[in-house]
């Protein structure tokens, strides 16, 4: 697996594995091809992710997003927490839910 794809894979896995209060608050932004238009950016909520493997993010509706098309991960306030080529822009460890 290429370095860039493995970076994307690890970023998506990291967010999916954190015990966040509501993982639906996070989203993946990816490039989507539209016939006659070209590429447009689309967003998929993390709550719609069924699984991730080393090639793609698979959604509960059966669609797949190839890892090389993912450009960023956004947090609950719409802020970018990870961006392709830049890595982590925000420390997500402070968002971990603690056991009471």
From Swiss-Prot:
It comes from the Archaea. InterPro entries: MJ1316, UPF0248. Belongs to the UPF0248 family. HAMAP family: UPF0248 (MF_01245). This is UPF0248 protein APE_0939. The lineage of its organism: Archaea, Thermoproteota, Thermoprotei, Desulfurococcales, Desulfurococcaceae.
């Amino acid at each position: 697996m290429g370095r860039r794809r493995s970076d994307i894979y690890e970023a998506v896995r990291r967010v999916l594995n954190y015990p966040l209060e509501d993982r639906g608050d996070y989203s993946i932004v990816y490039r989507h091809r539209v016939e006659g238009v070209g590429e447009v950016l689309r967003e998929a909520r993390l709550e719609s992710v069924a699984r991730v493997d080393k090639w793609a993010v698979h959604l509960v509706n059966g669609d797949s997003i190839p890892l090389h098309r993912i450009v960023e991960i956004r947090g609950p306030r719409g802020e970018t927490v990870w961006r392709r080529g830049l890595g982590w822009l925000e420390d997500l460890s402070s968002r971990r839910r603690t056991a009471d």
